[in-house]
Amino acid sequence: MRKRLVISISVSIYLLLSIWPCILCQSSFAEVKGKEEPVQGGTYRRPLEFMPRTLDPVLAADIYSVSVIHQLFDGLVQFDQNLNVIPAIAKSWKISHDGLTYTFFLREGVKFHNRREVTAEDFVYSFSRIIDPKNKSIAASLLEKVSGFKEFQDGKTNSVEGFKSVERYILEIKLSDPFYPLISALGTIHFKVVPKEEVEKSGSAFAKRPIGTGPFKFVSMKEREEIILAANPDYFEGRPYLDRIAFKIFHGAPREKILKEFKERSLEESFVPPEEMGEVVKGKPYLFLQKPILSLRFYGLNSLSKPLDNQNLRKAINFAIDKKAIVSEIHNNQFHLSKGILPPGMPGFDPGKNPYPYDEARAAGFMSEAGFPKGEGLSSLEIWSASKSEAAQKELNEIRSQLSRIGIQCVIHFETDWPKFESMLRSNKAPVFIYAWYADFPDPDNFLGILFHSKSKNNYIAYHNPEVDRLLDQARAERDYLKRMAMYRKIEKMILEDAPIVPMINHLFQMVYQPYVKGVEVNALGGPYIPMKKIWLKKRE
């Protein structure tokens, strides 16, 4: 899921995460967990770089919203530390041989925060909200293969044929065609269960006063300041250790400010700016956790914006940017250099690809083919960023300098209000923009389908290739895993040939924690999906 330049934002058993080491300095959470008995109590103060746009799962479209929603709600399934799909409210499930019928058997006694029990009807309602066009959910495309999807969206029916409460604790989902990413997609933030009576009573206010089933309950929100959650004593997996979570909103402030407050012990965790990495990791009592995550930060090239509808110009931009120098010299190698769309560790990843190595001569050649030799006749390009951090500004200035060498002049703009920035992307008003996508679920479709299918609401670059659309639809229906992965590799190659983006980096989850923080578990989906129900605070002596 999405976003930032620091911006943004969002595997079953076959994900080979063993190739990715988890680095933990000073101490090991795993070792500590085995030696010490968790204790209850305390408030965990967690920073958010921007204000979440919503706390309603169906409307979520950024990592800041996900970070909070994940603590408030549950779905049918969830991901473990290795991204296997495991039970949540559904204790078990079965899938028909033809891939068209999914049957989920729910736990009894799971309660919403208003103390009403969850039933299969609640999932029918919650999933129907995703499809409802009034909600404009970015997850609606994941349910296109559900029987009755189009009829419900077009207002021809009052219910979705493919969602059925067979019994009080049995839910059935019927598809018109196979969609094999579905079971993994059901673990994403949008497929959480909500109580119909509370949504209808609160209306749009539900997004600011949510009621879920999760380990923490909503308490209060101060716009651009903080969001407070409290432990749910009736949680079906048991009461969490923490009494409260206080999300502190920094509203686009530099990460240096967040780290400063952390050092003053006003926060339990912090991001680590590149220039601070050495000091924080070495010789300090803090706990530093690092792990690669399924993500991609890129420059989007909006094909609706002239002259970026010119494929050769887009290729020139790709060849002109020295990504390796930017990662090493500006970001101190805090990121992995990206060579494509799918990140390392994602099924379908091809380690051998590198379609656009830095090559100024080839960039100049494509400028000529585009009709703009040495930039002649080319107007300035506008680049937009939601981050105004020191590192972001350095990178953007370097990008501007590199592009100027082949005759492309750039004007840099900042919009640090995330909802405004996202709204600009949705309306295709940013010709070039920096953006990051964090996986919502561990499947290639979560990158290739969500970002590049012409019908996807997250296709902010207005990319449209009918053959790519056709192959994406075909891959989603392919039961054979190896064939499916081969199809996604072909799709990625086709997209990269069209050059609608400039892939830059794959993120590393890098956070520093106070030495008394215990029980942190991070999977390759990164920080927003950390189960805070497992965190506890060792009492300070």
Can you describe what each PLM-predicted range is?
Residues 47-97, 128, 209-211:
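N-terminal lobe/hinge region of extracytoplasmic solute-binding protein
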Residues 122, 131, 138-195:
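Surface-exposed binding/hinge segments that line
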Residues 231, 309-401, 405, 464, ...:
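Append "and occasionally in soluble cytosolic enzymes with long acidic Gly/Pro-rich linkers
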Residues 511-541:
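Long beta-strand-rich cores associated with HINT superfamily self-processing modules
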Residues 223, 368-439, 481, 509:
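Ligand/substrate-recognition segments at binding pockets and active sites
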Residues 207, 234-280, 409:
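Ligand-site clamp/hinge motif
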Residues 91-142, 172, 261, 307:
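Aromatic- and charge-enriched surface segment that lines or borders ligand/interaction sites
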Residues 31, 37, 327, 409-426, ...:
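Extracytoplasmic/peripheral linker and loop segments enriched in polar/acidic and small residues
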